[in-house]
Amino acid sequence: MTLLKRDDIIKIIETCQIKGQDEAIIRALMYMNLGYPIMLYGPPGNGKTSIAEHLLRYISKGDNFYRIEATEGMTEYHTIGGFHPLSMSGNPELSRKFIYKDGVITRALQEKKNLLIDEFNRAPTTAYSGLFMLLSTGLLPVEHSETVLKKPEDWVLIVTANLGDEGTFKMSAALKRRFIPIFIGYINRFTEEKVVRVYAPKLDEKIVKAILDFAEETRRLWQEEKALPQGLSTDGVIKMTRYCDLSISEGLDGKTAFTDAAMHQGIVIADETDYASIQTINELALKIASRL
């Protein structure tokens, strides 16, 4: 990767659709300039993937990079490669023949393309044994061809992760140390209000305040009281805004529109198996709605 200059960094920030994450983006770019792989982590719905894609598009001059979304069933076959039956049909002769298919990391190295692994910790650590070796030594043995791939000096790797989220695996400390973690958290209220106004410039000020109050309080309940598994994301704020704007324009009163939107997003962030969690979010929605 060509060393990013100040003008590059300014352009990257100005053209990023995710607003309010300037400091995190600058930190990520500084470490990328030093050649480190980056892990963007934080609560879901705050733009980790969009930021990662934006950075890679700028650095790779377009979509000239690989992207894979990790899953629970992912193995080294998907990341590094492995043998695959020549045919999955009922032909017994072909089904006994195998070909070797390179995984996404191997292809990225061979073609000298940058790589994004989204939802990194939704795959078990065992899927990344080869990646661990690559990040530790700069080398990746390709067993079937008895060759060794070398990590290009300008190769960029970005992964995203929701640490501690349901359905994720705990990363080994050794693997985690190979990355520079950059936190993508909730943006401040001032910036979030500007985002709301982009989507609904004419939405009543009281409704906007109610939406932002709801988001702020869910985040407090998550961070300070642990009463919710997560707070409302900026994506959730946008969905509430758009729903209220459309509903009110079609004749629904603001109080009902807000209550509906808050209940909808409340189910997303609450623990649906925990009645107390659902009750907490419903009571919060009704409390804020009562001010309208």
Predicted regions and their residues:
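C-terminal regulatory/interaction module of P-loop NTP-utilizing enzymes
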Residues: M1-L292
